[in-house]
Amino acid sequence: MRNYGIDIAKISVIPNGLQDMSDRLDSIALRKKWNLSAEEKIILFAGRFDEIKGILFLIKAFRNVLKIYSNCRLIMAGSGNYDICFQEAKDICTKITFTGLLNKKDLNEIYQIADIGIVPSLFEPFGYVAIEMMMHELPVVATTTSGLNEVVNNACGLKIPLTILSESVEIDVMLLSEKIIYLLQHPIEAKLMGQNGRKRYLDNYASEIFRINMVKTYNSLFQ
């Protein structure tokens, strides 16, 4: 901006806002609806099935998690290249639920019954899914790619640094496994992170906050 002579003081950054879809539904009834047992710990990925979303690293990490917590289930909600998922997950496929592309109502139900949200993207301009997870009080494990690093702070989740190589970007699978296991081992801390995430959503990313910030910015132009 300095190269173009732009006055930084005249720039306002307004984060996108999302409508609050957290309905506090009966989680026991929802688990029955989705054929999930009450004992299973649900780890949730929501998004496009593409390598840029880090799904292969997630499946590898989940395999490690199962060695410690066999009562876990990975729900992968979305659509895209199923082949790359099936190939990597063939030995643990009974522990993974592929929902296909969900409408908003069904996706919000899945958010309500999940225990941990995972956003392992290798690149993400803005963390819509992370915000949705925070909206539903999920502790989030996310990478440090630019969009996610801004949205998810240390109070509402755990971060995974990306490894930048000459021709690729990678995630440390063992570290991702350890972060998930940590949240499973510390449910009270995980719950607090979820509550912090909910507050962060309400304070920064709720649609009403977006509206207020937009009006304030427009009004400032005429002062």
Language-model-detected regions and their locations in the chain:
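Nucleotide-activated donor-binding/catalytic signature segment of Leloir-type glycosyltransferases, i.e.
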Residues: F86-K105
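Conserved donor-binding/catalytic core segment of Leloir-type glycosyltransferases
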Residues: S37-K53, I59-F62, I75
